[in-house]
Amino acid sequence: MWKLKIAKGQDDRYLYSTNNYIGRQIWEFDPNAGTIEEQAKIEEARQHYWNNRYKVKPNSDLLWRMQFLREKNFKQRIRAVKVEEGEEISHEIATVALHRAVHFFSALQATDGHWPAESAGPLFFLPPLVMCMYITGHLNTVFPAEHRKEILRYIYCHQNEDGGWGLHIEGHSTMFCTAMSYICMRILGEGPEGGVNNACARARKWILDHGSVIAIPSWGKTWLSILGAFEWIGTNPMPPEFWILPSFLPVHPAKMWCYCRTVYMPMSYLYGKRFVGPITPLILKLREELYDQTYDEINWKKVRHVCAKEDLYYPHPFVQDLMWDSLYICTEPLLTRWPFNKLRNKALEVTMKHIHYEDENSRYITMGCVEKVLSMLACWVEDPNGDHFKKHLARIPDFLWVAEDGMKMQGCGSQSWDASLAIQALLASEMNDEISDTLKNGHDFIKQSQVKDNPSGDFKVMYRHISKGSWAFADQDLGWQVSDCTAEALKCCLLFSTMPPEIVGEAMDPVRLYDSVNVILSLQSKNGGLSAWEPAGAPEYLELLNPTEFFEDIVIEHEHVECTSSAIQALVRFKKLYPGHRTTEVDNFINNGVKYIEDVQEPDGSWYGNWGVCFIYASWFALGGLAAVGLSYSNCAAVRKSVEFLLRTQRSDGGWGESYRSCPDKVYRELETEHSNLVQTAWALMGLIHSGQVERDPRPLHRAAKLLINFQMEDGDFPQQEITGVFLRNCMMHYALYRNIFPLWGLAEYRRNVLVPLKHNYI
């Protein structure tokens, strides 16, 4: 049986931590664990997911929940409540529902104070890892039999009815993920006609019916070239000389978005080496199976720009294709011949220096799973027996997650982000005395997860920004500062600092709070908006060079309304407690941030969400930021427009339901389901509360709260519904903890802001 291990790791030559592995979450298979009854419940959960996989595609993340609730002997002892038709919500009913949610959620806290959860969803995360392990000869050691079984389960569970796989679990089938999933199945031992429900045959038919893998997007062309199932001459150039360009040029690594930089860093190394893995009998078979013509007869030069229409979200502009063609025809032939190949060798050396720097400063976690696999493979190409590659191997478990739909690869984990939101939700419940241990543990996790230092050495030369005082998305070992993660964690620390230490633990040292403020202030742009990782400011026209076909806005840093709002809320609270610290800068930040939020409002009154689905998500953040400075419906036109948008999109059942299609389409799309989405309902409910809706007309709030209460499950949990996370416009993320955090938080804010406080015996 699979078991989740928390904060486990043993320092050695290849594995080390900056904070004793706080926040680390790894899965291990124990063949002797679990009773027959426990194993039967897991199988029941797997079967239930399989039977309903086309109805609700995100899993309910049940395996670790079953484990934690069992280990803590949790039983819901608070009676369930429902709001009948025509019945008003009493303070007692709201209190009972809230307490049930809080007691259940508190039982899910890990021993180190965070809440584990899946953060995955894209279907291109896992196959490259399997391919990398196959190429390097570590497949069977990294993925023993039970791992392979769960990986295949995941692939089967998320195959679409037409035989393909989407870019993410709710998406339409794409060539990229269908081909990668097919290859993954074949590497893991399935035959060309094998797999559950003829998975391989159906996938291959989809591939051939849609033009074969010559139409795979650029990332797919790169991975297939590495594997030996495509030819490098059929890819667009990724010259490593990019890393030795003079800094005054507009196209320079220092001006790139950090994710783009750290992905194309190892990718350009592998391209510069023209690395190809061993050509095994399986690779030769794939060359036959994936094409609708003989492999040796393919005109590779003509397929560089070919991309299946199902994958094409961002068509390359003419100027970009012209650049690729110029590099392909003129530059590459020179750089691969003497004497210019000396420059190529120098570029490869510098590129690998940057790869090692990023690896070391993230404890070999890297920024995320896409970079992780590419950097790991680059290290192996440099030295198959070297320490760098072995350190990468030691961190693979940090990315793997097991649920009832199988084993997948996470982006990097969302431990700090989830914990900060969870703590604020619990504090809003005003149950501090009852959940003191939960709050203490959560507070301790937040304090121990703060990044204590800047990147090593002369980090600016390595294109890095300050990180001391920040919080990463996952844990301290990751080390990468994120503005909204920092702001939300700072809010928690400030809230805790005003509470009795015997209830929530000792407050954080003010100096460390100042460090957090320094990071936040450093990331504001001239337009008042806040970027996520590093300061924005590179020319917008560089986005014309976006080399991907299925993402948008990946070349440079951009400002985000969510990050800006989080920072405003944190700094307003900070200013009240520390009015003398960098007063002018804090005031200017807040004023400019508010102006940015007002400036980027959509004509319909909403805001576009960059990290959640979509206009409802961003509207909740924006209204929270405006409310923090005293702006409401009565004194702010932007708030009035936003309220009109939210009330206009409220559904007949009292909730809200926004389709993920809003994100790529950039217009509001309603869910095509009869039911509303509870997470989005909570966002809208809290946004309206921020606006002052309770003083105008509380009826929309009552209707929303009724929906949340009536959908609560017997044990205090809430059901998993549609996916609610997103990145880069077009790819969705499943944050499995959202279904607990936000309905709980929404009910808590409703109870303390809408209902008249009364005391009741609710048990």
From Swiss-Prot:
Organism: Solanum lycopersicum
GO molecular function: beta-amyrin synthase activity
Keyword terms of this UniProt record: Isomerase, Repeat
EC number from the UniProt entry: 5.4.99.55, 5.4.99.40, 5.4.99.39
Name of the featured protein: Delta-amyrin synthase
GO annotations of cellular component type: lipid droplet
Function: Multifunctional oxidosqualene cyclase producing delta-amyrin (48%), alpha-amyrin (18%), beta-amyrin (13%) and 4 other minor triterpenes.
One Pfam family in the UniProt entry: SQHop_cyclase_C
Family from the record: Belongs to the terpene cyclase/mutase family.
SUPFAM superfamilies with a match to the protein in the record: Terpenoid cyclases/Protein prenyltransferases
Source species taxonomy: Eukaryota, Viridiplantae, Streptophyta, Embryophyta, Tracheophyta
Transmembrane segments: none
Ranges occupied by PFTB repeats: 148-189, 513-558, 590-630, 639-680, 701-742
Catalytic reactions on record: (S)-2,3-epoxysqualene = delta-amyrin; (S)-2,3-epoxysqualene = beta-amyrin; (S)-2,3-epoxysqualene = alpha-amyrin
Active-site residues, record numbering mapped to chain: D484
Tissue: Expressed in the leaves and in the epidermal cells but not in the inner tissues of the fruit.
Domain of life of the native organism: Eukaryota
GO-annotated biological processes: triterpenoid biosynthetic process
